[in-house]
Amino acid sequence: MSRSVKKGPFVDKKLYKRVVEMNKAANQRNKKVIKSYSRCSTIIPEMVGFTISVHNGKSWIPVYITEEFVGHKLGEFSPTRVFRGHSGSDKKVGR
C-alpha cells in the first residue's frame, strides 16, 4: 500500500534541514556532499543537483540526484548486498 497523499513524502528532518540550508547558501558552486543514514527518505525536487552519500551498512555510496530520481527512495540507489554470481557449470560427466 502506498503512502497517503495528504501526508506527503517522508523526508528525514535532519536531511531536509541540511538541504534547505545549502539551497539558501549564496555560493551554489560549493555544494558539499551530504552524508545520510536515512535510506527511507523520499527524494524531493529541492534535492536535485546535490550529491548525497547514503550508508549501506558498510560504506558510504555517493548518489548524484537528478530529476529522474524524484519520488524514489535514497535506499534504492545504494545496494546493501553483493551478488557474486551463481556457481559454475555443474554438468555431470558421462554416465
From Swiss-Prot:
The keyword RNA-binding applies. GO terms for molecular function: rRNA binding; structural constituent of ribosome. One of its GO terms (biological process) is ribosomal small subunit assembly. Keywords: Ribonucleoprotein, Ribosomal protein, RNA-binding, rRNA-binding. PROSITE patterns: RIBOSOMAL_S19. The keyword Ribonucleoprotein applies. InterPro entries: Ribosomal_uS19, Ribosomal_uS19_bac-type, Ribosomal_uS19_CS, Ribosomal_uS19_SF. GO terms for cellular component: cytoplasm; small ribosomal subunit. Protein S19 forms a complex with S13 that binds strongly to the 16S ribosomal RNA. HAMAP family: Ribosomal_uS19. Belongs to the universal ribosomal protein uS19 family. This is Small ribosomal subunit protein uS19. The lineage of its organism: Bacteria, Pseudomonadati, Spirochaetota, Spirochaetia, Spirochaetales.
